[in-house]
Amino acid sequence: LLLLSNSGKTREIVELLELSKRMYPDIPAIVITGNAQSELAQNAEIVLFTGGAPEICPLGLTPTTSTTVMTIIGDMLVVGLMEKIGFTKEEYAKRHHSGYLGSKSRGEIH
């Protein structure tokens, strides 16, 4: 289970982890957060700490820097997993059956 919360305090995410632990205790939780001391991080099996960089929003409120860092970490996880399991264009095409990406993965668009 992959959970993302910069503060580590997002109520819905904390509650989701609690529910997951009750219903599916054997599924490990991976948390990406800017607050490694948060309740969310403390209850996860794996914590990927973003460094807690300040948001570039002039008000310091809107998630900006944190969402970019989380996207990069997520992309790294996906690419690493694709390489590990040998994910192919054919597998990709099965999941993108229409549209531009589906056509490109099947070699219909160059």
Regions found by a protein language model. Name each.
Residues L1-I85:
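Glycine-rich phosphate-binding loops that contact phosphosugars or nucleotide phosphates
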